[in-house]
């Protein structure tokens, strides 16, 4: 999501109070007003009136809507609660320059505010300089990362920037149609400007802001020239880059206009539709209705474009997109819309959109043509507005299996009455329940509503009409199915999905990783709660299901498939969805996931009908009787539950019955899984026998010596034709080495890593999978065999967490080993180094793993965790991640003494996450704990004006302020 830190785009203003006896504009503010005029030169007409008096207890937000007023005591009535609004409270037209400090969060790109806690931070930065393994040391594995160069080297390099600019300019003259050259020119110009500033005065905050503005203006000028020269696919790249930069420079109205102009001129630029949605939902001025209308407009255009193509209308000469690409764009927008609705509190609407589209994808009646025409709308609206159970609801059978005149009344178990409370505290206590336990869509017909019912619980066809799509591509429908489960809290995506650029950019990034984070409720009584179960966020790895079952074998690692703290009705709906989809469509991967889900539910005693579990498992195995992957999963789960004999029988049956169907890759995978299960029960002889069966299929006596087997495995390593084959062979070779002791494990692992790198697959997902399995083997050796050899395996773990910082398994085992030698700080130091040097999803992942490290080592100390969050929230690409802010606010709620920085922190949180109700709720919680009820009321009003979904209300006569606490939403 684009950053919204710039001065030209309004933010929520601070909650700074203005006392009745203090003039908000005094001589002490002259310096600030001077900066005000300089920074907002492009908005001269919108400057604040200088004659505002203390009797005018309201401020006009000239950068937001014209009628945007904050009402003071007895001056204006508090606005009556309404569901939509044309104005937004709290838009700050300017950003304040704050005093420089070495620690703390950065406010609006200016400088850091020091955050004071009741305990001093004990993080020892000097330990960063400690030497680790060096070249030449036995077992050293070089890290494939770029290290920051020495400052003197950077200065030397910067002297050549002008020369590089000249060379690039000459290349542009020869090849003006290459976008890469124009972007390179922008980068060189930016480096030149910042290098000159750094050498002149690196402490001048105003100068730095000026350089940033100048750099942006220069790059925009370059891109404007480039857009006239570049054509084709490169043109879309440049347009996207141009609009991204421009959104930091222009006003929100101008940016919105630019986006619309480009999209009208180039409707085939599907990536721009995504950028448009990201921009719109990331700006604090836009209300919920504004954003929903924007999504509706995008959907209408893309669906019309898809309909025109299906009608065989003549393509535009510049239209190079396919139907598949358009459907991809629609799917991407659909997921983003549902996330947006969920974040704003409209969980019922988001769930209903998923339900409706799942009915169209998998339960579309055969007698209807897949076309969104009048016949379709008449039939589906009748189905949706009836009392018939919909997808994932109890007794749901699918739209195609329901007769037109059929209706079945469902039980309504949830109250939908709107509560009205007399205090903010009571309102918060009741409203926060819906944050952690959102209610389902009401299954009772809207015609039965009473005057006190909450209308947003009842979703009629008109509410979802603009957001339903008939996907014709099986690949898109397949992907949408897993997006639904990710929305429910099971972030599993088949490896094949990750090969697509749309899904790779979305699921490998922040969106996928955030599913693994523990919730803010993990913090109890001022401490980080004891170790929780963690979801493993690397679901796109090859052989992921097998890896996850292996992780389940180690109870101390405590991984899980889904969040057990989900609302009860969500878990029930998810289980019904699993059942409907597994038996209505052929999906081996989903069937395997469903088996794991059932086993975990049974293990955790969460299934109310345990006898039904075995019955469902048998039905799955019967339907997928010819599926090697499903039976392979079932065999491992039986072995995991202690049924070793049954597991042996299933593995043998796979080779006997499916021998003719087994591909070479599948054969390797099954043998690998079988051998690894033997390893985990310390059956060394059985493990060797299984591997010999693979190597010598004709030798029934299995008397071949181990040396010959080792030579064959080494030969297989030299002749791998694919990454997947190399992965399985390396794992089998590693298991063999563990069981035979013919070579040291560290040498074996180092050899396999070298093989990956020699093939050019040094940072591939297959190599990550290999690192994960090896971590588990090392963990098994340490916990079961009591064999600790940390000095030799430390380089392996350090390389693993650096290359694959999102991998919780590698981090957990690494932390375990270091804690045994009382070197708990080493993982922290490593995490800090990665956090400061990496970017994008890697930083996010590192932060998450650092959180795991804190829980594992110091569950009673959150200081390291706070410091890591400070650094993370300073990252321009990550500071808008609501999950960070929610946990950050929760910790500050428990640890921050006084109210000195509360205003600045809450303002920054609201400005960074303008479309997230959860952040607003945590801000209100923090303000109430600090006894700042008047400011909590303002945040409540902001929620109403933004259009967030609230299930309860505060009495109108309560929404007024004491004379001593009159508040004005003004610039910081």
From Swiss-Prot:
Residue positions where Phosphoserine is found in the record: 970
Localization in the cell: Nucleus
Biological processes per GO annotation: negative regulation of RNA catabolic process; nuclear mRNA surveillance of spliceosomal pre-mRNA splicing; regulatory ncRNA-mediated heterochromatin formation; siRNA-mediated facultative heterochromatin formation
UniProt keyword list: Nucleus, Phosphoprotein, Repeat
Disordered, as annotated region: 1-61
PANTHER family tied to this protein: NUCLEAR EXOSOME REGULATOR NRDE2, TETRATRICOPEPTIDE-LIKE HELICAL
Protein name: Protein NRDE2 homolog
Organism: Schizosaccharomyces pombe (strain 972 / ATCC 24843)
